């Protein structure tokens, strides 16, 4: 995770920010506590499955959300409630570089994704659009679909409220928490530039 954070830190230079205008409309995220029902998926969930290529031309997040996981789980958008959490296996978000992959998940109202590991480009894209992701092998191994979990980003804790278990996840550095809380890198950079 540290090398990913270090790599992200290079994007702290707002002159290198390039995002579509609609990304500025990404809502801010309350990073105090995330709580929701778990929907569980396997390993190597790639971006082509998260949002199939035939829908990548869609730029409106709410429209894009309608097709999230369409080929993997056709009922995904119908069963997800705002605040629900995806728990998946290792290498989540592998495959082609699609910023629309984490955007489509975020636009469904999903609060976060928890996985043992994320593909590096998905990891960066998720942070860039202000979507919280957490690494925890224990959570993946011990949380079941339907469990209710609570995530404390500051403490780096994932609590399974159904079973009473607590798992660790490395907390984000403060600047990454700020990017997520602002709704993404574009808004974060815009506000930093405006502040001088």
Set out the residue ranges of the language-model regions.
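Feature captures the catalytic cores and cofactor-binding loops of soluble hydro-lyases/lyases
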Residues: 51-52, 56-155, 164
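Short, low-complexity, charge-dense intrinsically disordered segments
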Residues: 9-19
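Alpha-helical scaffold segments in soluble metabolic enzymes
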Residues: 49, 63, 67, 125, ...
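N-terminal, positively charged, Ser/Thr/Ala/Gly-biased leader segments
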Residues: 3-6, 23-52, 187-196
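C-terminal binding/interaction regions
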Residues: 146-189
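N-terminal, intrinsically disordered, basic low-complexity segments enriched in Arg/Pro/Ser/Thr
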Residues: 17-21, 30, 76
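Conserved phosphate/anionic-ligand binding catalytic regions in large, soluble enzymes, centered on
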Residues: 45, 93-99, 180-190
